[in-house]
């Protein structure tokens, strides 16, 4: 059985990237929460 995690930087950025987060209301809420928490990295 192959491993389920096949890393790809492009796929990661497109799915979990900043622009993707900002494109939806829920995503903006995530960014807001991470800012409030003081995360160094807000998104992938």
UniProtKB/Swiss-Prot annotation:
Domain of life: Bacteria
Pfam family, any one: Ribosomal_L34
Annotated keywords: Ribonucleoprotein, Ribosomal protein
InterPro entries in alphabetical order: Ribosomal_bL34, Ribosomal_bL34_CS
Any one annotated GO CC term: ribonucleoprotein complex
GO molecular function terms listed in the Swiss-Prot or TrEMBL record: structural constituent of ribosome
Any one GO BP annotation for this protein: translation
NCBIfam families: rpmH_bact
HAMAP family with a match to the protein in the record: Ribosomal_bL34 (MF_00391)
Entry's family note: Belongs to the bacterial ribosomal protein bL34 family.
Name listed for the protein in its UniProt record: Large ribosomal subunit protein bL34
Provenance organism: Desulfatibacillum aliphaticivorans
Gene this protein is translated from: rpmH
């Amino acid at each position: 059985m192959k491993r389920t995690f096949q890393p790809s930087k492009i796929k990661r950025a497109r799915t979990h990237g900043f622009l993707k987060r900002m494109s939806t209301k829920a995503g903006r809420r995530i960014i807001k929460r991470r800012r409030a928490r003081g995360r160094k990295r807000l998104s992938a």
